[in-house]
Amino acid sequence: MQQTIQLRKFAARSATAFLLAVLCGYPLYIDKFSNLGVVKFTGVCTLSWAFCLWLGALLLVGAVPRSGRFSAKDPTLWALGAFVFTGFLSTVLSLSPVSSFWGLGGYYGGFMMVLFTAAGYLAVRAFAPQGLLNGLTFCVGITTAIVTVLYVLNIFNIDLIGAYEDTAIIERAQFFSTLGQKNFNSGFMAFALPLVFYAFLVARGVRHTILYGVPAFFGGLALAVVDAEGLALGIGAAVLVLMCQKMFTTRTLRRIAVIGAFFFFHAGWMQYMRSHFYTQGGKPMLAALGHFGLDGFLICTALWALLRFGLRGREIPLWRAGRVVAAVAVTGTVLLYALANFWPGFPSLGRLDDVLIINDDWGTYRGTAWRITWCTWLDQPLWRKIFGVGTGMMHTAMMEWAGSDVTDRMKTFYAAHNEYLEQLLTTGLLGLAAWIWFIVSHLRKAAKNWLRPGVAPVTLALVSYLAHAVVSIRVSMIFPEIMLLFALLQVFCLPPESDALPAEKTHRGKGKKAKTVRPEPVAKPGLVRTWAPPAAAAVVMMAVCGAASRVIFGFLF
């Protein structure tokens, strides 16, 4: 019994290191831009298989998962199996099975990525401890701050590590982040910022407020600089979900006002820098609010002061009002899009037309990507509509569909810029249905266990990413993190777990009453002792696996 508990604890520490490596170390793993996609893919693939094999070895020698981690009646496990199986079918029936297996026809997101992310999901779900949220969130906050600072440096053409020394200026302007494509940065921020902001929203006491406030400060900077409309969509969706929860009070709104002040401060500063100094890359949608940076900062500060001093510490529930605001916002947005696109006589709304009217130019030509992806799927035979053209084969299928009518713009699209449309084309109706089943089964379980520690922030992070996916790409730089968050969500949804305490001992002296001796409570290790070993293991494993991936997957380079 004791050996099983010790092995389980060791496996839990290993799972913690795995999460730190993928969520915090892997986003900082970079190389020359020319091979960025395959470098990221092979690095995380090697890392995931290494940890999964290690945890599998611990399982074989007696590290049994806790009771309740897996159940034959759990729909989330069946949904995972359906997701993997439909990916397998689409790969076998692909236009090019080899390319689909490795994802060489797209953004290195083939069936191999489905396999190692599913294995990572099962490993984390089996052994990840329930009490890791605070430390994990803080580490994600540190990574967020580093990513944001490097992103800003490259906007001003400052490249600290020389990752682009062999790259043309035009490429630097298009992919201006030191950490690679803006799709990676926006996808990373889409799930990282809700974790960072939520930790700040619920922090109690001066120490924890400052501890989580610093990453939140850099999170406000990320909102002001990351060039991706999808990030605004994802964070907006997470905020709407948060407003509908019963935990939404005046205290929550007060902390949101602080985050708003952070954002407007950075947006105003970036607006000044862009107008007075050379910058490269695009300008985010939210950055337009930099024109009102000072006004927004003052309004947020005034709101914070009103809620802080006017209510004198009282917390008033706002979730009913929040649900009304969320319903009005969603209904109004849907109505505006419907009128702008389907009512010919709808009046122009000026610059908002660029956002509301979906055509080929919409969203930096995302409208073109959506149209050609949808038309390519419609033109497939029935069996391909059901099973798909193969994972990662969007570009190949589209080129065959377009034929001689292909345009230079169409040639640039290697993804649909909508994960759900791409899932429909590449894995067919079955694959899309399996993925939606996987998502819905997890979110339903989260809704039933919202008040359990850890469920709310991870759910908000996933909601943000899933909304972001409507206008983005499933890249190998982000999808492994998302699958691990789905696994972590299931761990947090479980009832509180604890190891069995040592049995009480009874001593009976001669002629005396029995005396019960209770065991001494086990002292919990400090923060450094708890997190230093898994953090060090995460860094070492990322470095080792990154180097080993060049040897193991050398044929892909």
PLM feature segments, named:
Residues 181, 365-412, 427-431:
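TM-adjacent membrane-interface loops and short helices in multi-pass inner/ER membrane proteins
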Residues 37-46, 71-73, 105-107, 283-293:
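Interfacial loop-to-helix junctions that mark the boundaries of transmembrane helices
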Residues 137-144, 213-217, 515-547:
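Signature aromatic-anchored transmembrane alpha helix within multi-pass, membrane-resident enzymes
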Residues 29-43, 99-100, 165-179, 276-287, ...:
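Juxtamembrane membrane-water interface segments that cap and precede transmembrane helices
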Residues 59-72, 90-102:
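Transmembrane alpha-helix boundary signature
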Residues 339-351, 540-557:
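Hydrophobic alpha-helical transmembrane segments in integral membrane proteins
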Residues 6-29, 48-61, 81-84, 88-93, ...:
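Alpha-helical transmembrane segments of multi-pass inner-membrane proteins
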Residues 1-9, 68-72, 310-321, 497-532:
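Membrane-interfacial, low-structure loops and terminal tails that flank and connect transmembrane helices
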